[in-house]
Amino acid sequence: YRNNTSSSRTLLEAAANHGVRNIVFSSTAAVYGIPAGGRASEDTATQPINPYGTSKLMTEWMLRDLAFAGGPKYVALRYFNVAGCEPGGTIGQSTPKATLLVKVACEAATGRRPGVSIYGTDFPTPDGTGLRDYIHVEDLATAHLDALRYLRNGGEPTVLNCGYGHGYSVRD
């Protein structure tokens, strides 16, 4: 909560006090929790099941309230699972500290890691592993730029999902 809620509150207060007009916020699909039917649209009820999702949702609420009070307008981008890197390797999962599934799988495939551990094999899916909707890091960067353009052109505060709308099992 310190990073995603308290620090965000401090940042939003400073932005409002210094005349910032537009904010693009990196949120998460974790705000949905486990949606009925397995799919989440922007209209799906938010019911986070972990502190990460709750803390991001709290920041979305602060953005909403600040915009309603005449502060900056915002677009909250709800990321699903970010994967990949840009060709030069400066952003994304080619960086040394990246620990996400796709990076781990690539390291295993190239012999830099002994294998991939799969946690959770009792999901109600054909192979028992969780389904994930991945989005490439470059497409996510484009979404940020598009969101900023939208706000600069007079767009109203909104929330957008950032994924492709198709899930792959962890084992896939």
Model-assigned labels for residue ranges:
Residues A15, A67, A147-L151:
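Hydrophobic pocket-lining residues that define ligand/cofactor binding sites across diverse proteins
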